[in-house]
Amino acid sequence: MARLEDPTALTQLPDESARVRYTSSELQDYFETLKFPQRFLDLGNSVLKDPSLARTKENGLPLLQAITRYHTCNVPFENLVLHYDPHKIVTLDPAELYTKIVTRRRGGRCMENNIFLGTALRSLGYEVRNCGGRVSRAMSPYPEVRKNQSATYDGWNHMLLLVFLGDEWYGVDVGMGSMGPNLPFPLQDGFESLSIAPREIRIQKRSISETHATGPSHATKMWCYDVCYNPAESKKTWTPVYCFTETEFLPQDYEVMSWFTSTNPRSFFTRYITCTKMIMDEDKEVIIGNLTLFKDTVRETIGSDRKVVKKFETEEERIKGLVEIFDVNLTEEEKNSLPQEKRLA
């Protein structure tokens, strides 16, 4: 983002020569952050030596699948900067995000995680397009919203990536917390896949219910990402998670989106402290659940089973839990910058 104090320093996509790219050494440090096993380190190093391999399904897709899986399990989806940071300002600068995610072992919300990942993928040789989405109100933390407005969507408030492999585009999203797809999905109308068992995901191209169009043929069609929690039922019930477009979004688009979601008092992110990491099985082949901190409680969800892991009584306990459970370390300045009204007793 441009400097806040200078009204003439407007955000834009830099010229090609000025765009941030991570070095081979920085990408190898990112692989270390992901805790890649040797087989994926070898694959990643092969792509580093020959970036053209990144655009093939034979090499690029397995590496992309591994990066997506290991990123969501080792880089948290979190909004701690909005509560503990002394300035409460979210950076979307790729160089600063590298420091935050790789050097400090922190995470971020959708735009932080996906801007960082998009930069890493381009640095590896992938063709990547930044896109935007609207989160479904069926995902709202408020029961009354889910009950009364589940067929509607928020405004543009989400980011995801499209990655071109072989001859088709794949959706990639490491910034949706526990409700993310957790795998690269082909941009195919009607695509369905197992995500976190038993949950299934679906991709459809359809119009959404909110439209001024006078008929279905006039309504704009969006790509819609849905989930089914109980696919064993005789008739599957699909719940919308978000809709998105193939239109390329620019840094100035995300600046507007991030500013709203990080400053609006009605925003989930400004009201509640949250942190999520996904959990892999013992063989590190599939994601089986998640650990999520919401306000003062950490819950573990494995498949359909959910339990409370820890409930914090004091702020000191919550900060200790961030370290022990999520491997998130706050500085003393950050610990002291949480407003008094948000501190646990």
UniProtKB/Swiss-Prot annotation:
Among Pfam families, the record links this protein to: Acetyltransf_2
**InterPro entries in UniProt:** Arylamine_N-AcTrfase, Arylamine_NAT_domain_sf, Papain-like_cys_pep_sf
Q: What happens when the gene is disrupted?
A: Eliminates the ability to metabolize BOA.
Q: What SUPFAM superfamilies does the annotation carry?
A: Cysteine proteinases
Q: What class of enzyme is it?
A: transferase
Q: Where is the active site?
A: 110 (acyl-thioester intermediate), 158 (proton acceptor), 173
EC number(s) for this protein?
A: 2.3.1.-
Q: In which pathway does it act?
A: Xenobiotic degradation
The induction text for this entry reads:
Expression is induced in response to 2-benzoxasolinone (BOA) exposure.
Domain of life per record: Eukaryota
Gene Ontology terms for molecular function:
arylamine N-acetyltransferase activity
Q: Which UniProt keywords apply?
A: Acyltransferase, Transferase
The record's family statement is: Belongs to the arylamine N-acetyltransferase family.
Q: What else is known?
A: Fusarium verticillioides possesses 2 unlinked loci, FDB1 and FDB2, necessary for detoxification of antimicrobial compounds produced by maize, including 2-benzoxazolinone (BOA). The FDB2 cluster arose as a duplication of the FDB1 cluster with rearrangement and expansion by incorporating additional genes.
Q: What does this protein do?
A: N-malonyltransferase; part of the Fusarium detoxification of benzoxazolinone cluster 2 (FDB2) involved in the degradation of benzoxazolinones produced by the host plant. Maize, wheat, and rye produce the 2 benzoxazinone phytoanticipins 2,4-dihy-droxy-7-methoxy-1,4-benzoxazin-3-one (DIMBOA) and 2,4-dihydroxy-1,4-benzoxazin-3-one (DIBOA) that, due to their inherent instability once released, spontaneously degrade to the more stable corresponding benzoxazolinones, 6-methoxy-2-benzoxazolinone (MBOA) and 2-benzoxazolinone (BOA), respectively.
Its protein name is N-malonyltransferase FDB2
Q: Which organism is it from?
A: Gibberella moniliformis (Maize ear and stalk rot fungus)
UniProt lineage: Eukaryota, Fungi, Dikarya, Ascomycota, Pezizomycotina
